[in-house]
């Protein structure tokens, strides 16, 4: 008769805890250069002051180590299944963070008109918001004189939207193509602070790693779009 050994959560701690904070991995994020994994917030904060992996010391990237990070959704699901109640606790903390962030930032004088515009948008389009944390975004058309396609890509009549923090740049591109009635083959670039964003980047990732690091930036986050430029 085969005997089955029971494993405790602590048997797996080496694989599911963060080297930086020593807690369970929250939004596990892997450094592609060395394959070490950390909490997303821990590694992003570490890279504000260093370009080296905090565990092995290897230089991740000379100028922008954030480009070498990849979320590990599979590991996140494994951790949530191993640790009872962790998913609910993390979701509650995340919801509270975004509610507090939006409340604090939108009280500023520069944001009052934007908030009114967002409310008008909601009245016109209905409330299709998901139950997960929301983020307000301003979508600005980036105009470059003489660029091909500038007559096709226009500014939106209602440029303020509210969406899930988990929405990706790819989804934003589809939204823009639909609103601007662009051909299915037409491609756009989406930028934050002048940097082209990858299609798999989420709004939360962009906010945390690009937008909030600029002290002069206010809420809501501004993303710019333009006809795609082929540098090849």
Curated annotation (Swiss-Prot):
Gene3D superfamilies: Phosphatidylinositol 3-kinase Catalytic Subunit, Chain A, domain 1, Zinc/RING finger domain, C3HC4 (zinc finger). GO terms for cellular component: PcG protein complex; PRC1 complex. Residues 93-128 are annotated as: Disordered. It holds the Pfam family zf-C3HC4_2. It is found in: Nucleus. Keywords: Metal-binding, Nucleus, Repressor, Transcription, Transcription regulation, Zinc, Zinc-finger. GO terms for molecular function: zinc ion binding. Residues 93-104 have a biased composition (Basic and acidic residues). The keyword Nucleus applies. Component of Polycomb group (PcG) multiprotein complexes; the complex class is required to maintain the transcriptionally repressive state of some genes. Component of a PRC1-like complex. This is Polycomb group RING finger protein 5-B. It comes from Danio rerio.
């Amino acid at each position: 008769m085969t005997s089955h050994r029971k494993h405790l959560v602590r048997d797996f701690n080496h694989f599911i805890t963060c080297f930086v904070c020593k807690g369970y991995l929250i939004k596990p994020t892997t450094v592609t250069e060395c394959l070490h994994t950390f909490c997303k917030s821990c590694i992003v904060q570490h890279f504000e002051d260093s370009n080296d992996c905090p565990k092995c010391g290897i230089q991740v990237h000379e100028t922008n180590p954030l480009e070498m990070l990849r979320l590990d959704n599979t590991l996140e699901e494994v951790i949530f299944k191993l640790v009872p109640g962790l998913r609910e606790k993390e979701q509650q903390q995340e919801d509270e963070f975004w509610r507090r962030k939006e409340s604090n930032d939108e009280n500023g004088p520069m944001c009052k008109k934007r908030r009114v515009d967002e409310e008008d948008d909601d009245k016109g389009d209905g409330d299709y918001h998901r139950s997960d944390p929301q983020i307000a975004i301003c979508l600005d058309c980036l105009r470059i004189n003489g660029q091909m396609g500038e007559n096709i890509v226009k500014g939106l009549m209602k440029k303020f939207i509210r969406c899930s923090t988990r929405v990706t740049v790819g989804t934003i591109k589809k939204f823009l193509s639909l609103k601007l009635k662009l051909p299915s083959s037409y491609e756009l670039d989406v930028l934050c602070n002048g940097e082209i964003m990858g299609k798999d980047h989420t709004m939360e990732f962009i906010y945390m790693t690009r937008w909030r690091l600029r002290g002069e930036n206010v809420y809501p986050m501004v993303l710019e779009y333009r006809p795609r430029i082929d540098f090849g």
